[in-house]
Amino acid sequence: MKKVAVIGSGSWGTALAQMLTVHGHTVRMWARNASTVAEINERHTNEKYLPGILLPQALTATTDRAEAL
């Protein structure tokens, strides 16, 4: 298992992050929007880009690029 950073929380970034967690990796995703980060971390969803998809607990988000990396 590796720790992976995904830069961007749009549909592609969120789908990639989800796929990586499903395959056993811990993923920290960078997002520029604080409300998106809160939604991902608190509700484990990103309804704007992947409606109806529950994101894994191993996927977290931050607005801090250094923290993501």
Model regions: which residues?
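NAD(P)+-binding Rossmann beta1-loop-alpha1 motif at the extreme N-terminus of oxidoreductases
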Residues: 1-53, 61-63
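A short, aliphatic-rich alpha-helical micro-motif
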Residues: 68-69
